[in-house]
Amino acid sequence: MAKPGFYICPLILFALFVYGLFQSPVEYDSYYDSLEIQLNYLYPFLVLLPIFTCVYGDELKSGTMVTAIGRGLSRTKVILAKFIDTLVLSLTFCLFFLLMDQITFDRFSVVLTKVQILRVLSAYLACWLKIQGFCAFAAIFVYLTWNSSVGVIAGLISIAFSKMILDWLQSHTHLPFYDLTLLGQADQARRQFDAGNAWVHHILFVLLWYAVFLAFSALFFNRKELDL
């Protein structure tokens, strides 16, 4: 039988789908203006809790992770497996949000140009990279405390305040506090893609940030004493 947290994800997706069916008529310009807030705050907030409940919460409660380690699975492989789990789930959510937008466009007969479609796709790609970054950052606190709730709190706080704080620091010090972070690099990749410029190197910097978060997770997890 699937883990209890597994059912949270489809339930939330279904609720969002129903909500999308009753949206007011939209035009591309107003839609794209509101998309920025949705992708930076609303969507990460919506998906972090169900992802963590599904990937970490149930496993910690049931002891599945400890059992796997006791049977010889390395802690590094556990961390990587959980990272891939969150990667797949966050992608699933983003694809569903994109599908909701498409259904809304079809319902109100909104036809997008090729350029507009590419802008929407790049926005969702950046959103996916950010959500995975929030999950990878929050996972550090799970391995540090062995408590998924602490990870959720850390993730929600980072979603709510990280961009605001980093933007403030950058504007007041004129140092690239935001631009060099995972969030900033994801935004740079999106902007450069939209402008038709080179953007892949920004994705590589995002992957580097993932590696840093995974390294910290491994550092704390390897020091954690478990009752095997």
Where in the sequence are the language-model features?
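Junction motif at the cytosolic side of a transmembrane helix
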Residues: L208-L228
